[in-house]
Amino acid sequence: NYGWPISSYGERGYGEFSKDVPLHKSHKDYGFVEPIKVYSPSIAISEITKIPKIFNENFTNNFFISTLGWEGQLANGQQSIHHLRFNENFDQIIFEDVIPIDERIRDLIYIKEMNLVLLVLETIPAIGILRLTN
């Protein structure tokens, strides 16, 4: 358990509820696991997808994180795909990259038979394709 809604490095954003229930910044002090990665301010995560090694031989313990967000927020990591690679124990990020899309990404779907990732884009609406090329 990572602590939500008791502990978070983010901020509450929903009115009266935030006055009645404190949001603690420490996780460990309240019996929760400290997060490995924190996005503050929020990048508006919409999907987290494990990307298999077949996608790329170097992709061991890799995840794509899609984000929503608003126009003009690319610099804050919104409307992008965040690529994270974890160590063997999944307790440390050993690689991180951001792929700007400049569109709200509602969903990511890995299609094994075609070895590609579909992006379901919200605002346009459209479907994007993420495929590795040599």
Language model regions located:
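Blade-level signature of beta-propeller repeat domains, shared across WD40, Kelch, NHL, RCC1
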Residues: 107-134
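A generic structural signal for well-ordered alpha-helical surface patches
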Residues: 79-82, 103-106, 115
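Conserved blade-ending motifs and adjacent loop-strand segments that build the rim/top face
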Residues: 90-112
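Beta-propeller domain segments
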Residues: 1-94, 129-132
